[in-house]
């Protein structure tokens, strides 16, 4: 658990890459039923197979050297009640993925959530603490509607504020439209993960994403 996510291990010919540390236990988890306590949240370590083969009990595991200059890792969360119910196509999320990929990021996860603070906070914590991604971009839920809870949920899980990015985005938006001042998006840090709220409009996403995926900014959160 002291090793970072993306650490790689060899067991004979098999190569594994750590993908997540800790995982929420389900109420009916078999381990919990058998032992009365689940180890998943505090001891669970998960990996994906990079090179397959056969392993046996007692095989020695070797920690492999880290990659040289690995890509930064990102996750994208779309907040939309209608989108989460399949009633509206998510156009902003795929656009963000496209822009991140073009900028050299490895997008580990994408998801669509309803505008629910509890669900958003849980995913932000999991992605930052368990998956240890460098960057989480949210899109949607930054306006004045009572259901727009993205900034509040983001601040609730933050360790530190990083206001300059959100301020730069609002400044840039104001140069295009006076409505730019209506965005309540925030930018914060949880551990080593940067979390940035983007508006839900694909047009605004395209205009604003360039600010924080530029080289000077992105290299600051390695």
Residue ranges and their predicted role:
Residues 12-14, 71-74, 131-133, 178, ...:
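Short coil/turn connectors at secondary-structure junctions
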Residues 208-210:
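Active-site-proximal C-terminal subdomain of hydrolase catalytic domains
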